[in-house]
Amino acid sequence: MYNVFQMAVWLPAQNKFYLPPQPITRILSTDEYVTRTNLFYHATSERLLLVGHPLFEISSNQTVTIPKVSPNAFRVFRVRFADPNRFAFGDKAIFNPETERLVWGLRGIEIGRGQPLGIGITGHPLLNKLDDAENPTNYINTHANGDSRQNTAFDAKQTQMFLVGCTPASGEHWTSSRCPGEQVKLGDCPRVQMIESVIEDGDMMDIGFGAMDFAALQQDKSDVPLDVVQATCKYPDYIRMNHEAYGNSMFFFARREQMYTRHFFTRGGSVGDKEAVPQSLYLTADAEPRTTLATTNYVGTPSGSMVSSDVQLFNRSYWLQRCQGQNNGICWRNQLFITVGDNTRGTSLSISMKNNASTTYSNANFNDFLRHTEEFDLSFIVQLCKVKLTPENLAYIHTMDPNILEDWQLSVSQPPTNPLEDQYRFLGSSLAAKCPEQAPPEPQTDPYSQYKFWEVDLTERMSEQLDQFPLGRKFLYQSGMTQRTATSSTTKRKTVRVSTSAKRRRKA
């Protein structure tokens, strides 16, 4: 019997060939060419204090007399450790300076924060607030006329975060963009583009109005509070740093963000015909005031809500076992960059001083001031590590960062040049010979000299006596390296039985 289900089926020719992907350069993990020793050191900073005005800086004769110290700003610490290659070790077997170099490996960190918990208030005396859009009582459609700015204050979005790496952290924000040769009419909305930049000390965090360049995109200077109205709010570019090839900018991070919208307002300003509400989305009204539509430019005031010590990321120790990137905590060039954002201690100090000898109260008799203070303390546990000076390791490190080899006083051989060169006599003073050559610019030894960081020098604050410091004692206990001073063994007491004949017998 013929099986109809086994008939031959014709298929068209498949002329598609799938080739294997192109090989990529393999990025090595630091565990593959860095050897760790059993030597650990503790490093701690002094008490780091900061005092200033919470909303803006105050200048006199074009000189800043009182800096801006906002609780909503990033603090970026550039921590420098001592060069371990200059240490004098008693044990000569620790490393061979002819074939090895020493580096630090981060094992523990604690970021201490002083001052009580508090909510910082920010605002603007002329904030663009047209009307209440949450519970309106009147239909306001005069958004294109007059001046409706009000004195408004609120608390910002609550943020706790810190980020650790051996290179500066990257941030992202939105700003205006213009194509070459494009004509932009006055009043038109510009193009916007994302900008990636280094997060510097003093850069503003996102407080609930987005990561953007407010100086370029909000020319009315009244849409956001004073501390960000002419600033750029940046947000850490976690995606970019997570995909970084060498993993130097972000060993690990911790963050906690929370926000809700407290009030809903409308903005003043002309919406324009280009972005008017399409008539297909509503039915027209027959009578005023609804024949003219109100503005659709809505905004909500952020609020970070309650702060609590139960959800604090700071004042606790963190132990580094495995980083998310290829750099497993190696502090290249003996430095770390600690990016901190924390506005849970944002209380502003209100200071009032008498300006005359009057003994009665009047607003005119006192001068009021605002100050904000911040307190930090940084502690680290670092491990001594070795790198063998093999050609493969040196070539790989030179590709990653040539400055590392320069710090190690190693140079890469240059290709041979022409041994015969021209040397003119009186070249600098003679008008007959050719023009003297320009002196080559001095090589830049610090690639981050154009950025602003809080410098923390720990070159003389390192110790191998871990038990003398709080973080060191925690590390000894967590790692099981604590030396026990007393044995826990106990001696069993002998039981004695006294018979009626007063003879002592040892219990069997």
Curated annotation (Swiss-Prot):
Claim: GTP-binding is one of the keywords in the record: no
Keywords, alphabetical: Capsid protein, Disulfide bond, Host nucleus, Host-virus interaction, Late protein, T=7 icosahedral capsid protein, Viral attachment to host cell, Viral penetration into host cytoplasm, Virion, Virus endocytosis by host, Virus entry into host cell
Ranges annotated as biased composition (Basic residues): 491-508
A GO cellular component entry from the record: host cell nucleus
One example GO MF annotation: structural molecule activity
GO biological process: endocytosis involved in viral entry into host cell; virion attachment to host cell
Subcellular location: Virion; Host nucleus
Region (Disordered): 480-508
UniProt cross-references to InterPro entries, sorted A to Z: Capsid_L1_Papillomavir (IPR002210), Capsid_L1_sf_Papillomavir (IPR036973), dsDNA_vir_gr_I_capsid (IPR011222)
Family classification: Belongs to the papillomaviridae L1 protein family.
Subunit (UniProt): Self-assembles into homopentamers. The capsid has an icosahedral symmetry and consists of 72 capsomers, with each capsomer being a pentamer of L1. Interacts with the minor capsid protein L2; this interaction is necessary for viral genome encapsidation. Interacts with protein E2; this interaction enhances E2-dependent replication and transcription activation.
HAMAP family: PPV_L1
Protein task: Forms an icosahedral capsid with a T=7 symmetry and a 50 nm diameter. The capsid is composed of 72 pentamers linked to each other by disulfide bonds and associated with L2 proteins. Binds to heparan sulfate proteoglycans on cell surface of basal layer keratinocytes to provide initial virion attachment. This binding mediates a conformational change in the virus capsid that facilitates efficient infection. The virion enters the host cell via endocytosis. During virus trafficking, L1 protein dissociates from the viral DNA and the genomic DNA is released to the host nucleus.
Protein name: Major capsid protein L1
Organism the protein comes from: Human papillomavirus type 1
Gene symbol of the encoding locus: L1
